[in-house]
Amino acid sequence: MTSTNKSISHLPILHNPFLNCLFNNPQYFKSPLKGVVDELQSNHTNFTILVPPAHVLNEYYDPTTESSNSKTLLKELCYNNEDFIRSHIINTASPVSSTITPISKEQSVIYNTLNNKQILIKNRIIYTGKGFRRSLKLKTLSIQYFSSFCDYFPKRSKFMIIYIESTLFGGIPPRKMLPPLPEVRETNKTDKDIDSVTFEKLLRSFPLLSKAVSDKFYRLFHHNNYQFRVLRYKNRKKLSHIKLEFQKILQEAFSIISDSVNVDNPNSEQTYNLINHIISMYPGIDLNKLVHEYVELNLYDVLWSQLIFQFNCPNDDKEAYDPEAILILTKEKYEKLSCLSLNQLDIPVNKPWLMNELHERISLGVQEFEKLADSSIMNSAAKTQVVYSTFRILTQRKNGNIDPVINADTLIGLLIMVMVHSKIENIEAHIYYIKHFNSIDNTNDGQFNYIMSNLDAVLFHFSKKESGYLDLIENSKKNYEIWNAIKNNDLEKVESIIELVNNEYPETELPENHFLKSKNINGESCLMFAIKTKRYEIYDCLINSNPNWIPIDSILFEKNVMTNQNLLMCALIEETDYKIIDDLVDIILNNATLEEQTMYFNMTDISGRSVGHYLFHNYKLISKIGHLIDWEKKDNNSHTPLFSLCRCYDHPEYVELIRAGFNCVYKKYGETGVDYDKHVDKSGNTLLHVLLKGIPESKMLSNSNNLVNVNQLNQRCLSPLMVYVKYNRLENLKEILHDSRLDFLGEDFKNYYNVFDYLSFSALKSTKSENFQNIENAVFNYYLQNYFPRHATENVAALNAKYDGGKKDWLIFFKNGDGFCNYKSLRNIKQILYLIKLKQPLSTFPSEESFWKNYGFGISTSPMFHKVRINRLIDDFNLLFEGLTFQESINQSEFFKTFLTEYTKETSIFESKQRIGEQLDFDKQSLGEVTYKLNQIQEIEYFLEYSLNNFQKYAYLFARLAKLVCIGDSKQVDCRNVLDTIMYRFNKTTVFDDIFTYSEVNNQAGTLGVAREYFYWIQMHGDELLHSIQKLVSDINSWKQMYYSICHINSELKLMEPHNTVSQESQDNSNGQELLSRRDSSLSINPIPEEELEDDNLGFLSNFVGTSKKARYKKLVVEKSEIVKNIMKLNLEIKWSHELIAAEISDFLKFRTEFLRFGIKRYISEEIKSLKQRSTELSKYVFLVRKDK
């Protein structure tokens, strides 16, 4: 433990105070952190840490101090408040409860924190629960592993952390948020509530009212009600009689209501109070209007059928019998007027842009007026509303539009067009119904009377009393002839008509009301019809017969007013004759000004698309008009013209289309550069995402000036690489794999899928496809070339994993360069690694405890953690495979095959351990009888002590280096996050945003993390080797203890032998050779017959020792014999271990150099990618700053 008297120092401070408090705290042994550290030390895989963003902790205040004069920053709580720390650490190994919704399959899990509070995690949202003062709902930003570099947590331990958008205690921002804008209350809300009330609803809502009047209304509306039989009989009668009968019924209905509150009625008082209550509930309600509409509702079918019957009677004597019932607009008249054009109605408007506005109003007015024929319109109020809306469309200006003057003549002309083209049967009956069956008395309503008078005027215009009616029919006939000839591709007919016109107007302009200038209600002229017909001869006959007939303004301003598509757009969409398109473009380029050309080619339709969005229909136009196109203009789907070109997947000349489009864009924006961020759609797709093929032709990756992020994720968290694999775009895949900026193993921040996951998804659909196999080979070969040692003759890689619900275990997918692949469950893999270590107990192969240190085997956890954990475990598997290619102690070929083959017969672990133990014993026995002298053991001991000291020094220095690399990785992340924050806040579009984009959404791992893993792996191998050396040193110490025990026993035995034997022995020893036995070995002993030891009267011992000495001698001999057996076994063990360790040391010295070199190469490669990525981001920033100047 660190002494409190010494000056305390620690590594560079982490930017996130919470992480710094837990992992870089020199006061970890003091409160409030001591208890937390003790619990995390015990089993760190059981816990997950919830980490708020750094800027929240550094800038926000504790909510409990909101009303205090001295507010406390949240970062202070990280160091001084144990409750705060414990509240952000959850025990994910033992959830309180876990439920899964049956339909969405979302899992909701409740966890306890270290201080027994509770949180709920559902759909990546964290909800505070029991124990928390405030109920909060926080989004999870990302899930990561944090590598601990401190000394008070287990070495090489990794902690799972979840970045959340704020603390579980909340936080007060440094500046007050602006209050939300007050909601604009609808002033007519009460009116809308009243309008929604009907008498029928009141009857359903108030049973007392229904009881008072429903029976009487039922009898009133019954078909057997003889009192009002006139409406039931379909015979000829005047419309005034129908109106009179309706008024009688209406008065009867009013009487029913008044009788219900009559004093003679026993329930009158209750009914009266109820009606007053209803009036108080809906202030301003008109009960008379409700009753009127109720009567209409019940009698509408009868009334309407009577009106239709009367209007459809022959008009022979109606002039005298009932002039109101004359039917004017019959089906025949509608047919004769069906091709009537607005320009033939003598309105005082002739400018093409104003005519477009009027045509749009007419088209919208027709759509609205047609609602009169809808079967749902069943009362006078609804019919009146339709008429009002139609007049509003025809007369009121829309925002941003040019406002033509709508005088009386213009309005009549618009109404004529609306009534003729809406073709409503019995329009006269509708107008009569609106006038005479209305629930509101409109006698003094000027607007209503003005509208009705205009409708009457239009009807009068079509009557035989108006001479202009015949002119309208004649104009419609002429329009029909030319339109029909064009649509039917009748060139001869068109030519004959044009010849007649040419004879009449040889060198002059056509009058405004001429049929060649006619348009339908959508604003489409003969020229538009010719373009849609796709016949150049007809088009040429119309536009080139006489240049005076169709001025340039007519071409520039002609469009379909409903789609807002001009002539060129329609020509491209209809894919008309290329000669028509070329001629139309030439006319515009030769006759319009540059400003007019730019406006024309960039005007947008209702989808927000310009001509540029439709150029894929004729991409050769790009060379003509591409320089006039705004390639950055987005449509309603956020697609630019260039984006639309890239999405035209079924184009027969797709590559040429891409080449033409991009070359034009580079030529136009070459000086300032192309801003590729403006070509991103609302789903986050970049041009690289949507491009089907032709990356070389687009020059997006090859042009060094292009600021393209090849790793950008769309809103579905797919990078271009993932898209190419998912949708089998082999050509693009090959190209992007050659880009040095590619983050090949990058994972998305939502599902944590990488390219191999999407490869496996595609494999389920198209495993037999040749294209897919090529994609699979390209991806795997890229991995081997860039992430696996190239010198290796054997290889295997763990690619991805899937969860097997049946086995309730993860299956890891392995594959080698020869194409062999297999799935292995984690349990099976754990057994394989365990048995390998049993077979090679003294090798540097990682032990079970070391390898699975950061993977909580068998620990249940939320699905949102699974993918992150398994991805990091896959990384460890690949490190294992990479490391083995630099080692010789383990048979690589045999080891790799165990992951690629499926055993047909499974063997229990117990049987496998037995066989391995027997094999190890056999290997040791094969060494034969092994004897060691002390000097030999001392030589081995010296070698081991030297190696141990050397490796301990190396381990100490390497551990410090690994720690610095680890902290360097964390500081890399801090620097990146701080720079991201600065760039975000310096951006003019986000500087005033209250909503902050958290840096923690991104992957919180630096490039030094790659080097760290290799340092850790070498460190783990070194620890295994140190452990083996220490074990052998321990065996040698045991051997020496046995050796000295034998020496001691030999000394005692010599003292018990006869004197002359001892003297002789001393004489022999004096010759210069130190022997410990008669066979010149301390491990030898002369066998003594037992009968000599047992018989007191026999043998030389009986002459000078007593019975007690005999027993002790026997005991020493037996003890020596046992020690000799043990030391002989230990000799075998030492020799076997010594040879293995010597080989392992040699192998490790080579391994640590080569593997570290490979790791450094990997780090440098990732660092270069990161620097290029950051360079692109900063260059974009500079580009935008310069562009804004």
From Swiss-Prot:
InterPro entries in the cross-refs: Ankyrin_rpt-contain_sf, UPF0507/Ank_repeat_27, VPS9, VPS9_dom_sf
Signal peptide: none
Family under the similarity heading: Belongs to the UPF0507 family.
Residues of the VPS9 domain: 321-471
GO biological process: early endosome to late endosome transport
Name under which the protein is recorded: UPF0507 protein C2_02840C_A
Source organism (scientific name): Candida albicans (strain SC5314 / ATCC MYA-2876) (Yeast)
Gene Ontology CC, one term: late endosome
Listed PANTHER family: ANKYRIN REPEAT DOMAIN-CONTAINING PROTEIN 27 (PTHR24170), DOMAIN PROTEIN, PUTATIVE (AFU_ORTHOLOGUE AFUA_1G09870)-RELATED (PTHR24170:SF1)
GO MF annotations, alphabetized: guanyl-nucleotide exchange factor activity; SNARE binding
Pfam families (UniProt xref): VPS9 (PF02204)
